[in-house]
Amino acid sequence: WFLDNFCFPVKEYYLKLGFDFIKESFDISGTEFIDKYMKRCHELQLHQGAIEILQYVKSLGIAQSLLSASSQVMLNEILSNHDINDYFKEILGTDNHYAYGKEALTRKWIEGLNYDAKEVLFIGDTIHDKDIANTIGSDCFLIPKGHVSRIRLEKTGAPIFDNLNELLQWFQNR
């Protein structure tokens, strides 16, 4: 059910779950979830092939950035457990834990780059990632290993890779 219904803004997903924000505000519900999530974030694992693709792309001299709808504080905490920060030129999260603001964050990021948006490749796992890539004029590849089902991702028209190893093979064969 989750993969077929999760969406941004996250508040809309909470409404699909049946939350009544008249009875309890989204600020309270969202904060309760994040507090519980952060207590277990050290348990999060990287997807199989994550290190290999980060290493390979870096070996090509291609700059990598990580942009997330997660808050910068949350992102820093999660990444501290994986020792992958050195692969990224920039690591950017939002200024809140409600997943608001990734589009504005991305616009600001792209304006600061010395690249044309057409030279940027977004790799994500949500429809929102594809929407943001479209907004800034970049290509986007999607991997159905996150919050959204493959069927929903296919509807975006973006190329779909089943996993990071498949994406790595694409890079190696280009």
What label would you give each PLM region?
Residues 101-131:
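Conserved Lys-Pro-Asp/Glu-containing loop-to-beta segment of HAD-superfamily phosphomonoesterases
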Residues 84-89, 116, 161:
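Conserved H-loop
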Residues 51-58, 110, 130-134:
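Surface-exposed amphipathic alpha-helices with a cationic face
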Residues 38-66, 72, 76, 103:
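Short, acidic loop-to-helix structural element flanking the phosphoryl-transfer center
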Residues 121-161:
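Acidic, Mg2+-coordinating phosphoryl-transfer loop and its flanking beta/alpha structural elements
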Residues 1-5, 85-100:
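A short, structured active-site edge motif that brings together acidic residues
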Residues 60-62, 113-119, 174:
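Glycine-rich phosphate-binding loop signature in dinucleotide/nucleotide-binding domains
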Residues 1-48:
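N-terminal helical cap/lid subdomain that shapes the substrate entry/recognition surface
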